[in-house]
Amino acid sequence: VGSEMCIRDRYNFAKEAGCNKIALGHHYDDVIETILMGMLYGSQIQTMMPKLHSTNFEGMQLIRPMYLIREADIKHWRDYNDLHFIQCACKFTDTCTTCNPDGVTKSKRMETKQLIAKMKEINPYVESNIFKSVENVNLRTIIAYKEDGVKHHFLEHYDEWK
């Protein structure tokens, strides 16, 4: 309920201010974590789009201006400028109230972040490869895909794709 209220308040504030866009703070690391989480925990291939129309608030768009900025760069900029981020639902702050007392969160996102760090030890390109994987989708090599909520199977196009 808390985060839903926050979202509604954000939209209402934007609407009252005459805005048609809301800028969100998601960054590059959020994007690659979301891609991998979708595969590992959601049985799907999808990404976090840099710009999209709101499905719940007519005429409102969501934009992610920090989509290509690394989390470490944002934190470096924050520290360089002696800034402190407010506590938020996405747990961007280093000290969050939803973390365990030992500072380790049990979230799937944190597990995914740690998994990516481990994979990076083996392959230094793993982060960019995850990001590019959703740009380089070849539908002819996918068993099935969804478009506008309708599932399509490769056999629908099998004879066309000779």
Predicted regions span which residues?
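Short, small-residue-biased leader/transition segments that mark boundaries at the very start
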Residues: 1-7
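Aromatic/hydrophobic pocket-lining residues that form π-stacking "cages" and hydrophobic walls in ligand
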Residues: 9-10, 74
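Glycine-rich phosphate-binding loop signature in dinucleotide/nucleotide-binding domains
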Residues: 12-20
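Catalytic subdomain that performs nucleotidyl-dependent activation
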Residues: 29-111, 115
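The feature marks non-catalytic terminal segments
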Residues: 83-162
